[in-house]
Amino acid sequence: RDPEMSRGLGDVYKRQEVISFLISAVMFWFDKYHIDGMRIGAVSSMLYLDYGKKDGEWVPNRFGGNENLEAIDFIKRLNKAVHMYHPSALTFAEENTSWPKLTLPIEEGGLGFDYKWNMGWMNDTLHYMSLDPLWRPFNHDNLTFSFFYAFSERFILPISHDEVAHGKGSLISKMPGDYDSKFAGVRTFITYMYAHPGKKLVFMGCEIGQFDEWDSDSGIQWDLLKFEKHNALYLSLIHI
């Protein structure tokens, strides 16, 4: 666990002035910039008081549990406000535990998100596709396990920005084999994604076979489309 992601915001969820500021800031983006959705990252660090912490570094809630009750209330209030004033807007949760009912409506006991990122599917599938084909038959559980929980939430299948940066390599560079095999691997990965239950989220650059990692300070290398393999990949994904 990333220590920075594990800290959350501590006790600030108990302060109403902070809650008001956070919700107002989000609503500003919807009202003034007309965004159509938002993703909340590291939701697990908000939901659990002990997330990423050792014994003695956290205090149980008033019921003796590890749930952050104030953060849960904040998430519900935020989702309620967004959907009340912008009914067509979507909210997404990046949450890497099995916290239940993330995408159920608040009135049904859920947290009110529209979708949850399926991080388990992403990690398992990327691991499988990165293996040499010789070893894939021994790792088919990476492809089948996600079906055990595929309908427990409203999932979106992501290629996270974190998985194509920070030294992890771009999507096509994760694929084994020679030059042609890497392009075939990306086509297979995307085809499997589109056949799997859940909404789809292809990260920028993956659709053209960009070998360089994503860099927030530079644009996508669209000039790659002048090369046959990259252009063929781009067109094949459109057909998919």
Language-model-detected regions and their locations in the chain:
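An active-site-proximal structural segment forming one wall of the substrate-binding cleft
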Residues: 15-38
